[in-house]
Amino acid sequence: MTGGRSEYGAARVTEVEGRELMRKRPGMYVGSTGVYGLHQLVYEVASRSVNQILAGGGGCVDVTLTRDGGIRIADDGPGIPFEATGEARVGDSLETLLTRPETELRPGGRNTVRWSVYGVGPCAATVMSSRLTAEVRRGGVRRVQEYARGVALAPPAAAGPATDTGTTIAFWPDPDIFDTVECSFAVLAGRVREVALLNRGLTLSLTDERPAGGTRSVSFRYPDGAGDFVALLDAETERVLPEVIAFEWEDERMAGIAEVALSWRSAREERVRSFANSAPTPEGGTHEDGFRAGVAAALTEHALRRGLLKPDGPGLGADRVGEGLTAVVSVRLDCPEYDGSTRGRLGGATARDGVEQGVREHLGSWLDRHPERAAAVIGRITRDADPDER
């Protein structure tokens, strides 16, 4: 046996073993065999579509829950590459994407949107579905490939001309793996809207063909990104300011981009939502810490300059500025660091420093340009304090 054949045989064994392990231990790759894990399949496939769209500078991604229990995800991006590289065969890129974990053909770093917790890639849907069909429209040709439980039934085949570009992946989750194959329209709609809010200008839609009373559909596109997010969170509350404060900046020290939006309400509780590369960080992290420190510093410095605080009195610490605060803190990093395997908390000192300085500068500038509104915010924060502290 030649060395090449030996390497090919070893690769095939690894692929088969990986597929069998994913089917035998699905919770290791998508979290559970319940509806949570089912939704992870949708997120893994949708992530690839969104990242191709964002890399191409716009477009839309459509998610459809079909009448026969399938999920179809279509985009109008450039299409998964089919071109041969070196001695690779036509179709290798598609097959690699659909059969091997963590081999997504997408831009890396700060341009990557992460929908799911696990980051396995579309291969999770290939392996954990009874069948999957991939259609790619690229270079004027439409090609199709079908899979059954992770195994390709045939190589990608030309299926006629294509007048547009894009990729459509349809899959039917395997009932032998999942306790249920019924996706929740409400849960998916919430996550689809969240991703649209965090990526301004991106159009995402969700359609449900299953209801007996007729199809239901929602579509999301938000031109103001995080600013729209805060406005939505505060839609039914009384606000201190007539508008949302929002800004975005790039910081090479943290190797990424930060987007922040904030406002204050008459209510007392704090509502801060944070994200890293579009994935929620429910446990917070250094970006949240930097945000709070930056807000406190900007407000304290402005209040002292305007005589709204006594020089020898207490400053507006993070514990005080959070009262009634609604905010969205979103960072897009080349190399995000996380504390813990669930990626629920962002780590890294550079993220904290970058967000703190950026918020301090941008919010400070906004306060200086709007002194009356700044006074209203500071008054809101200090109104329950002892008069001698003001």
List the model feature ranges, each with a label.
Residues F185, R193-A196, L204, R292, ...:
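Duplex nucleic acid-engaging cores and interfaces of nucleic-acid transaction enzymes
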Residues A186, E194, G201, S205-T342, ...:
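GHKL/Histidine-kinase-like ATPase module
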